[in-house]
């Protein structure tokens, strides 16, 4: 992929293929999420992995202009990039604070995830509770006493659904575990990812949409969002085919009648999956 543009920009004639990001659709998706959660719940915008490939700096700046005051990233480096464009927002780093990173966390006013009892850095922290995901977090059965020890330091406490898009029963089991473990903590609590938006009782103090912000519906129950990214190119050549003629590797397409086909200057190196052959 050669370039990325906002939807209202236009690439030069020398650009072969590009993506366009619609900020208007990001705003529409954000509004759909806000309608679902109501005014008493905040949005923590997940902008990890370069905002899922949509451009973290552009997306974070735009979301801040839309009133979003909390963000989450996977790494410290991502968080520092986001901090440059949202100087007054809260930023949670999911991978936590490694030894020696404390000065950078404090210098950029970042919040570190804590997911092990023995790793509590001297920075702003949110504790992750393992309510059933089994990946990271203090086990929910042990979380109560641990949170009590850190009560005066906590900026928040959170958990992560394992299968909110498919397994309703297990998701409710996780929510029950999380609520029990965090009762009375006195700080913000959040567990709902994009798929978790389907559970009103999981909205709590904040929700953490990622895919939904970018218009990827995580499940049929959360389908009121629209894709933000469009991949575009120019037609390289138009070709006329007769019935029975083939085109492409392995002759994957054979014309059943006369056809006019467009050849596009896009290939595997641009990210086009070979599995899409004859399925576009």
List where the protein language model places each region.
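Active-site anion/phosphate-binding pocket segments in diverse small-molecule metabolic enzymes
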Residues: 2-31, 35, 42, 78, ...
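Active-site-proximal beta-alpha core segment in soluble small-molecule metabolic enzymes
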Residues: 2-5, 13, 17-28, 41-190, ...
């Amino acid at each position: 992929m050669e370039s990325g543009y906002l939807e209202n920009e236009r690439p030069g004639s020398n650009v072969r293929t590009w993506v366009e990001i619609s900020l208007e659709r990001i705003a529409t998706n954000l509004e759909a999420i806000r309608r679902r959660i109501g005014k008493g719940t905040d949005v923590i915008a997940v902008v990890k992995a370069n905002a899922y490939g949509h451009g973290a700096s552009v997306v974070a700046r735009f979301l801040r202009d839309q009133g979003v005051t909390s963000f989450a990233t996977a790494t410290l480096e991502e968080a520092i990039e986001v901090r440059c464009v949202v100087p007054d927002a809260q930023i949670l780093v999911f991978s936590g604070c490694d030894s020696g990173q404390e000065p950078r966390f404090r210098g950029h006013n970042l919040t570190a995830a804590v997911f092990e009892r023995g790793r509590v850095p001297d920075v702003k922290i949110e504790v992750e509770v393992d309510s059933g995901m089994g990946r990271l977090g203090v086990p929910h059965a042990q979380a109560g006493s641990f949170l009590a020890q850190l009560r005066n330091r906590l900026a928040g406490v959170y958990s992560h659904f394992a299968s909110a898009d498919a397994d309703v029963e297990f998701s409710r089991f996780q929510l029950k575990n999380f609520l029990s473990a965090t009762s009375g903590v006195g700080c913000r609590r959040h567990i709902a990812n994009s798929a978790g938006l389907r559970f009103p009782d999981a909205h709590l103090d904040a929700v953490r949409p990622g895919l939904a912000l970018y218009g990827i519906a995580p499940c049929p129950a959360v389908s009121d969002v629209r894709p933000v990214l469009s991949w575009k190119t120019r037609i390289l050549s138009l070709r006329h085919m007769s019935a029975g003629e083939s085109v492409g590797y392995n002759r994957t397409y054979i014309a059943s009648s006369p056809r006019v086909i467009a050849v596009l200057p896009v290939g595997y190196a641009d990210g086009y999956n070979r599995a899409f052959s004859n399925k576009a």
